UniProtKB/Swiss-Prot annotation:
One of its GO terms (molecular function) is protein heterodimerization activity. The gene is PSMF1. One of its GO terms (cellular component) is cytosol. The lineage of its organism: Eukaryota, Metazoa, Chordata, Craniata, Vertebrata. Residues 2-150 are annotated as: Important for homodimerization and interaction with FBXO7. Residues 222-271 are annotated as: Disordered. This is Proteasome inhibitor PI31 subunit. Plays an important role in control of proteasome function. Inhibits the hydrolysis of protein and peptide substrates by the 20S proteasome. Also inhibits the activation of the proteasome by the proteasome regulatory proteins PA700 and PA28.
Amino acid sequence: MAGLEVLFASAAPAITCTQDALVCFLHWEVVTHGYYALGVGDQPGPNDKKSELLPAGWNNNKDLYVLRYEYKDGSRKLLVKAITVESSMILNVLEYGSQQVADLTLNLDDYIDAEHLGDFHRTYKNSEELRSRIVSGIITPIHEQWEKANVSSPHREFPPATAREVDPLRIPPHHPHTSRQPPWCDPLGPFAVGGEDLDPFGHRRGGMIVDPLRSGFPRALIDPSSGLPNRLPPGAVPPGARFDPFGPIGTSPPGPNPDHLPPPGYDDMYL
């Protein structure tokens, strides 16, 4: 137990009861696990400083000890309280960041010899058992809960573009005139069906209306001026607009037959 004897020697003049000796042992165990003492009390004070020694005034109240600690890398802070209840001491530890709590109850007579508080070699009884109980009852639970809270804490992540609903009023991506348009279309999310029907710019994607002329298969270009004596001026038909030519479309594949469905009641012989 390297360091405990040195700590005990520095605090020996202030150790006047069994609970003082137990808090001294608890402090040493916390420090050996990478913590520094900051000060006493629930709230930070102007005299706080990192130290491996017990802070000034650590045992002013023999019934309630309140110490604050900070991990060596500053990642976590502990609030340690030791409450004396008759011949027992209740140890309570709070980790500020995760708000995790651990507690342990110890019988003072099992680990402290009240008759030899001035002799380090005789003050502590069953020191290995005492150390094991502090580690398993306080240190390990706090560390495990802190690590678990950090691993399982939710991180806000936006879903990928393919899983988000497409905003029909968004501004289309800008492509300089000197560069070519990319040959691919933006992927649509599963909940964006029909969104293109609301897009006034009429991009290359389809909506909910079936358009055989835009089914994705190769087809001949349609001249919107077909059947007119003169050609339509440039820009008369917006790009991507659903436009029916004024006249026959020549050798292009014919459109859907308007009579491909039977009229209502065609099979009623009495109609």
